[in-house]
């Protein structure tokens, strides 16, 4: 195309590094394909994964496509941890705004940038495409476990915001979009189902298909060696086979692992299987190219009995390279395979079903035929190119700017700071009210908007101007802001509306602009929780506009406030209540894993919450 666009693909991992999973493969192929078709592409890698040095193969591939790989480091302290990657990505994007950002939903990498655009601070001319590989909950289901950290829950709240604030959403499977809608995720429109790019179309190089038609001599468990990928299903299915079918068979476990060893695999297989097979090997450090070479050995049958998948590259690569396989009939996997081949190669992920599939395959002199793709690979490339060339940021006309703001200062230090802030504010007339309490200050306030300033709040010169502008851009009822904690000098970000997470900690904000008609004398946590539960819109600026000397309230340090927040949740019937079962399960799983390390006050508060929820 003429005049390619400036594209930034934001990823957590990329090809060229051992252990890269499906999302990293998809992001890498997309970046290369867009670069090869005339776009100016940067591949931005969020902190958390070392990508140096890249393998020579992928260093060449990126260079040949004119793709710049830019790994980010965590150059500043950011809390909470689940928002840190998005804060670093935001810093990078606003320094050189591209025309289009394609951001992986994994780890909510675009959250801070999208929130900044929503409140009118930056990136107004940048279009955002959310590339949806699956929220934290889907990954947890795939691993056959309940999410067991509060951080994962918070990450999912941020992921929800990303899919709502983007200009387009792309999923590689219809199944995932259906899952999101069934779980009441609000998705930006338009949404697209575009299958992940294949190696052939991304690199523009034809692949040599595997040699097939011979007896199976090598069985390969292909995928990460863990429960969710079905390793125990595979092992149990082998134990159910007629042992004679395993005579002379090589067993290969091909994928990365954190815990499985060859000794453990042999123990799980049992003596009868071990005695029959010719060899048992684990290959856990191969890169993608080397792994595919192993699978293309004559007489190989790949087995992928995962409990849940979105659009697995393991299956797609077998289809592309003509590698015979058996896979689980789950999630979006069937969408990759031609209708007429699905009943041959897809099976429920149980030992009995996979044993029933493996038996005939091992007994056949010709093995099994490879499966064909459901769609022509070129369709995905055409769809991506059309989207990238046409997507634009949604038009968001600004609302009415607040004309008058009352700053209610409850303390001697805060009163002095409020007066200085009033002198520095340019966008609104400021009424400074010095009062002994928030209630007393509200009685005196006449402005449409109020800002409570406590002694532990040290506002920047542009705090009020920033809040007023953000409110006009977003139309929110409450606008809070990130702050700099006095004790560490980093940045403390907030979700604004954290849903059910607001029950256990203040993720709303510690300083904010509120409509006076909605304000009350409650503490920040209680006030913002009640407003969010009542359906009022709360957004939080991702740039620190104040220093804060206190700690955000949470059940462990503010039990009285926690009780008031709990009572607010109990009387609500809003969206946050639908998230409580998942939060409760997450807390239970977290306590089961870490109970000994949890402070006694937190344990008592959590037990109180659980008792109240179970009434």
Task: Name what the model sees in each region.
Residues 25, 29, 226-240:
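A conserved mid-protein helix/loop that constitutes part of the nucleotide-sugar donor-binding site
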Residues 175, 197:
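Carbohydrate-associated surface elements
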Residues 255, 264-294:
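Nucleotide-activated donor-binding/catalytic signature segment of Leloir-type glycosyltransferases, i.e.
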Residues 307:
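Aromatic "clamp/platform" in nucleotide-sugar-dependent glycosyltransferases that forms part
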Residues 559-615:
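Boundary detector for helix-to-coil junctions that initiate low-complexity/charged tails
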């Amino acid at each position: 195309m003429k005049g390619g666009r400036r594209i930034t693909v934001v990823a957590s991992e990329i090809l060229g590094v051992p252990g890269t999973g499906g999302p990293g493969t998809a992001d890498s192929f997309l970046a290369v394909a867009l670069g090869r078709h005339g776009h100016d592409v940067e591949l931005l890698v969020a902190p958390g994964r070392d990508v140096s040095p890249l393998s020579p193969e992928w260093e060449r591939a990126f260079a040949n496509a004119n793709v710049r790989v830019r790994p980010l480091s965590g150059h500043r302290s950011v809390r909470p941890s689940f928002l840190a990657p998005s804060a670093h990505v935001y810093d990078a994007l606003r320094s050189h705004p591209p025309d289009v950002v394609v951001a992986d939903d994994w780890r909510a990498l675009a959250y801070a940038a999208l929130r900044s655009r929503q409140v009118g601070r930056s990136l107004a001319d940048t279009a955002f495409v959310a590339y949806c590989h699956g929220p934290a909950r889907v990954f947890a289901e795939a691993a056959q476990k309940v999410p067991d950290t509060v951080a994962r829950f918070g990450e999912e709240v941020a992921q929800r915001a990303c899919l709502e604030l983007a200009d387009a959403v792309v999923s590689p499977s219809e199944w995932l979009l259906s899952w999101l809608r069934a779980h009441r995720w609000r998705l930006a429109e338009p949404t697209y189902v575009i299958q992940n790019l294949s190696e052939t179309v991304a690199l523009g190089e034809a692949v040599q298909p595997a040699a097939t038609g011979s007896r199976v001599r090598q069985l390969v468990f292909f995928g990460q060696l863990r429960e969710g990928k079905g390793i125990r299903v595979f092992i149990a299915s082998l134990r159910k086979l007629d042992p004679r079918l395993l005579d002379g068979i090589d067993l290969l476990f091909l994928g990365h692992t954190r815990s499985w060893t060859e000794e453990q695999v042999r123990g799980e297989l049992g003596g009868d299987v071990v005695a029959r097979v010719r060899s048992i090997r684990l290959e856990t450090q191969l890169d993608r190219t080397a792994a595919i070479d192993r699978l293309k050995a004559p007489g190989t049958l790949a087995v992928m009995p995962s409990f849940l998948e979105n659009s697995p590259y393991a299956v797609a690569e077998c289809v592309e390279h003509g590698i015979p396989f058996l896979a689980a009939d789950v999630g979006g996997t069937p969408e990759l395979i031609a209708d007429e081949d699905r009943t041959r190669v897809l099976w429920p992920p149980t030992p009995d079903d996979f044993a029933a599939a493996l038996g005939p395959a091992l007994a056949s002199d010709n093995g099994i035929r490879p499966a064909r793709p459901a769609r022509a690979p070129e369709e995905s490339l055409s769809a991506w190119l059309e989207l990238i060339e046409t997507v634009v940021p949604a038009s968001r006309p600004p609302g009415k700017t607040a004309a008058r703001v009352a700053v209610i200062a409850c303390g001697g230090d805060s009163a002095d700071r409020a007066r200085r802030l009033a002198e520095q504010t340019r966008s609104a007339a400021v009424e400074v009210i010095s009062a002994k309490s928030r209630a007393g200050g509200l009685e005196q306030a006449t402005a449409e908007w109020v800002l409570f300033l406590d002694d532990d709040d040290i506002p920047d010169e542009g705090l009020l101007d920033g809040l007023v502008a953000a409110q006009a851009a977003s139309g929110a009822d409450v606008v809070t802001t990130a702050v700099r904690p006095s004790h560490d000098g980093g940045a403390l970000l907030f979700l604004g509306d954290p849903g059910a997470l607001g029950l256990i900690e203040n993720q709303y904000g510690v300083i904010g602009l509120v409509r006076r008609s909605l304000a009350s004398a409650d503490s920040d946590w209680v006030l913002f929780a009640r407003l969010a539960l009542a359906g009022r819109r709360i957004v939080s600026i991702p740039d620190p506009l104040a220093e804060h000397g206190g700690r955000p309230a949470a059940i462990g340090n503010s039990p009285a406030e926690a009780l008031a927040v709990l009572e607010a949740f109990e009387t609500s019937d809003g969206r946050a209540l639908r998230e409580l079962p998942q939060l409760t399960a997450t807390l239970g799983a977290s306590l089961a894993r870490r109970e000994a390390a949890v402070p006694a006050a937190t344990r008592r508060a959590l037990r109180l919450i659980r008792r109240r929820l179970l009434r």
